[in-house]
Structures are given as structure tokens and as C-alpha cells.
Curated annotation (Swiss-Prot):
UniProt-listed Gene3D superfamilies: 3.30.70.260, 3.40.50.1360
EC id: 5.3.1.6
Record InterPro entries: NagB/RpiA_transferase-like, Ribose5P_isomerase_typA_subgr, Ribose5P_isomerase_type_A
Subunit relationships: Homodimer.
Record function comment: Catalyzes the reversible conversion of ribose-5-phosphate to ribulose 5-phosphate.
Class of the enzyme per the UniProt entry, highest EC level: isomerase
GO biological process terms, semicolon-separated: D-ribose metabolic process; pentose-phosphate shunt, non-oxidative branch
Name the UniProt record assigns to this protein: Ribose-5-phosphate isomerase A
GO MF terms, alphabetically ordered: ribose-5-phosphate isomerase activity
The entry's keywords: Isomerase
Organism in which the protein naturally occurs: Stutzerimonas stutzeri (strain A1501)
Amino acid sequence: MTQDQLKQAVAQAAVDHILPKLNDRSIVGVGTGSTANFFIDLLAKHKGFFDGAVASSEATAERLKQHGIPVYDLNSVSELEFYVDGADEANKHLELIKGGGAALTREKIVAAVAKTFICIADGSKLVEQLGAFPLPVEVIPMARSHVARELVKLGGDPVYRDGVVTDNGNVILDVHNLMIGFAPELEGKINDIVGVVSNGLFAMRPADLLLLGTQDGVQTLTR
């Protein structure tokens, strides 16, 4: 199967997993990126079975609306049963690197609210150690140079993602060459840097369920 076919298969597995648990009051959290887009397109076929969705980015909100799925502000939602999103890297502890699409902060907020965080990815995203994929860090623009210097002290090589402005009006530094050992500790250290909004390590709140699309079918990992 091609990579797109693997993404579609794992997106279908996520739909199949949540559908029996949805009702006409259910609101689904939806992530951002190519795999999440497959999930949206497949979920839309069942839009009569749930109330609507919370989007982790403006792009996702637009895609949901195009399918006729109501999009809710997270502040108006009292309960979020599921959040489904992709990842740039994942390990066996279901800790993730996310943010290749620059939506990491809103993704992290929705994941924090959801009872169950389901990560969907093709099998190539499963790694022994996180960090080969550059770690995105969302930064207040005026703090960019300061944050970059602090990230160097942590052993990284930050690169400004030129021309990218997040939905929150901030900029992204992609941190290369980080050897990520204990991911929750590093996530906290980076978040403590003044000027950092959030970073793409999802380790303090990892996924609850990881669905991996492989040539042998969809594999399931849980915490």
C-alpha cells in the first residue's frame, strides 16, 4: 500500500473505534494534517451520528464545515470524549512529536481536554527514540532570539520556520539534533523558557491509543 492508503486505513480504524461510542450529543476533537484530513473525510459519512466537532486549527475547521459538520468553540464544550490526530513521531510509550503543521498549541489544548486521545499514523512514524524529526516550538515573535539561545543550551539546533505564522499569531522554531531521553522532563524544561507558548512534545499528556497503518494491517498500541 502507498503511504496515503496506509493513512486512509488507519483513519478508517479510528472511525470504526469511536463510532459505536458516539451519540447525538457527542462532540469529537479533530486534529490537523494529512492523516487527520483522511479521518475527517471518513467521519463525515457518519455525521448524523454525532453532534459536531472541535477543530485544532483553522484549516481543520474549514474542512469540517465543508463536509457540513458543525464546529464548536472549545469554550462552549463541557465534555470531549475523543480527540483524533496524527503525529510526526511516536514511541512505544505513546509519547509523540507533533507540530509539523504548526498547529501544536491548539492540538495540545484539545488533547488535554479529551477523555481519550487517539493518535493515527502510518507505521513509519513509530521510532525507538524521539528526536529525528525536528521538534517544533511555538514562540512569541519578540522572544524568538532569546528562546533560540536557550534551546541551544539544551543541546538543540533551532531553525526559524521562515514565512510561517501560527493560528495564534506566533512563530515556529524547529529544533534539530535533540536527543530526547525522558520526554516529559524535556517538555517541561522547554515550556519553562520565557517566550515559549508550547512545544511539540506530547509526553506529559501522551496518546491513550496509537493506531498504526502497516503493510500487514492496522496495529494497535495502548498505554
